[in-house]
Amino acid sequence: MTKTLYVGMGCFWGAEKKFWSLPGVVETSVGYQGGTTENPDYRLVCTGTTNHIEIVKIVYNESEISTRDVLKVFWENHDPTQGNRQGNDVGSQYRSAILCTDDEQRAVANLTKEQYGQVLSAAGLDPITTEILDANEHTYWLAEEYHQKYLIKNPNGYDCHAHTGYSLPD
């Protein structure tokens, strides 16, 4: 059975790429979610007035990869302590978020947030600012075609490398 999870972890170009090679991930796309404006576009989202987040939609086969393993990639490939930014990318659209489609995902998201937060706290980092939201309450708006699989189309394109360097415990 496939499940869908939505994550915000900074610029969606590089974030989407992190999930391409995971066994069990059957589809990814990028879009906007979590805001108040209907049918937003990139230009509008970048103004910071829509409250939308740049999102990676991940469809995965739960018999091949667990929600925890998908979220391990999420936590370890951005800095969830930075609030409305990732590296040099600043704005509310770059904030850290997990939008869950069911109770199991929400439970795993909350547990891994707590576990990763303990690791980061022990290392002296700031608290995690990641929002955990119900995806069913926030429409996912597919981003423009030129954003989809951006780093395949533009192999030398921008890929934010902000992360903490710490691992989620097993």
Q: Where do the language-model regions lie?
A:
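Flexible coil/turn and secondary-structure edge motifs
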Residues: 1-170
